[in-house]
Regions:
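Alpha-helical cap/lid subdomain in secreted, periplasmic
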Residues: 1-150
Length: 150
């Protein structure tokens, strides 16, 4: 904010969910919502245009898998995905409330994965480990963000 940007992309939430299930230090949905609300308010006060981004994915398949060298059963994966969807709904709601632009990366990633993951791979489509983006994932986000800069 101190650099006084004209445009700010706010893209947070993956670690809030992932760390909740991985190391027990993530955020619950109220903490996430209140924190995101504060970031939006502080950023809007500068006059910058805000583009809110939904969190993307944890894992690229349906079912259990090893996430960053840590096995996760199907129940845990379903819970993480339910949390990611709830966090994405928070972003969508706050975007309407604060009249910001919305970049629904979660929807975009899920669509891309459903069209390009015929083998139900847990990683390698848009991430290299189920969480961290590979070159294709980074390019997909960059291409989506560029649309807002034109």
């Amino acid at each position: 904010i101190e650099l006084q940007p004209d445009i700010v992309f706010i893209y947070i939430g993956i670690n809030d969910v992932w760390h909740k299930y991985n190391v027990g230090t993530g955020s619950d949905i109220d903490l996430y919502k209140n924190g995101l609300r504060k970031i939006i308010e502080d950023t809007q006060a500068t006059g910058a245009k805000i583009i809110l981004c939904t969190p993307t994915v944890i894992g690229e398949n349906s079912g259990e898998f090893t996430l960053v060298n840590n096995f996760k059963d199907i129940e845990t994966m379903e819970a993480m995905n339910q949390d990611l969807e709830a966090f994405s709904d928070v972003v969508r709601t706050l975007s309407l409330e604060f009249n910001t632009e919305l970049l629904d990366l979660r929807k975009r990633f899920k669509t891309y994965i459903s069209q390009n993951n015929g083998t139900n791979a847990s990683k390698g489509i848009l991430t290299y480990d189920g969480v961290h983006l590979n070159n294709v994932g980074n390019k997909l986000i960059a291409d989506e963000m560029i649309r807002f800069l034109k």
